């Protein structure tokens, strides 16, 4: 899928020159096509999900049983809009992320502006229906947030989504063609460490 290829390309760029065998990665709701490639590359690879049983650990992103500063990289794609308290999830991701670590935390862009629902939507089961402004909440929890866009890449890489229905998603580029975004959040290096 285009989204997975975009994530792979971006992660490859962000970790260029780093020895992945010395890095730890926490992967929420792991996509099989990424897991099979990432697991052998990282010194520590931990897959996690609240409901799935084919993961290393069943974990609630809002309350993780991991020590502070445990992971160099966290992938949590298309998850936070389902989380009852997504801000608690962001806080926890920041807590377990090592200083200098990065987290890729994309969500789907459903509306022009984020809609908060009082209860999970009965059809989509979403607590939040994100818009481009959703990523502004990340700035409260991380020292740096940069939104990478598929439109920043050569069109031949095909890092855009194709939708067959006519839903007016906010990232529309052309008929049935939609841009994708991946926010990369970073935790600052600990300036007090030796």
Please describe what each predicted stretch is:
Residues 61-74, 91:
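A short acidic, Gly/Pro-enriched loop at the edge of an enzyme's catalytic core
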Residues 1-65, 178-194:
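Conserved N-terminal segment of class I S-adenosyl-L-methionine
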Residues 84-94, 98, 102-194:
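S-adenosyl-L-methionine-dependent methyltransferase catalytic module, highlighting the catalytic core
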Residues 72-84:
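A short SAM/SAH-binding and catalytic strip from SAM-dependent methyltransferases
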């Amino acid at each position: 899928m285009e989204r997975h290829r975009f994530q792979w390309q971006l992660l490859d760029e962000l970790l260029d020159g780093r020895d992945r065998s010395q890095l730890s990665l926490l992967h929420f709701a792991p996509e099989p096509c990424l897991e099979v490639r990432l697991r052998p590359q990282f010194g520590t690879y931990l897959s996690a999900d609240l409901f799935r049983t084919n993961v290393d650990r069943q974990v609630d992103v809002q309350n993780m049983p991991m020590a502070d500063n445990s992971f160099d990289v966290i992938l949590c794609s298309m998850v936070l809009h389902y989380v009852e308290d997504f801000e608690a999830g962001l806080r926890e991701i920041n807590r377990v992320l090592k200083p200098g670590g990065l987290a890729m935390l994309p969500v789907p862009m459903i509306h022009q502006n984020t809609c908060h629902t009082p209860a999970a939507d009965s059809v989509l089961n979403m607590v939040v229906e994100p818009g481009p402004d959703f990523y502004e909440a990340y700035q409260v929890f991380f020292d740096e947030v940069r939104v990478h866009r598929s439109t920043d890449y050569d069109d031949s890489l095909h890092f855009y989504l194709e939708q067959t229905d006519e839903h007016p998603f906010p990232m529309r580029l052309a008929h049935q063609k939609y841009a994708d975004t991946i926010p990369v959040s970073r935790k600052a290096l600990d300036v007090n460490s030796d």
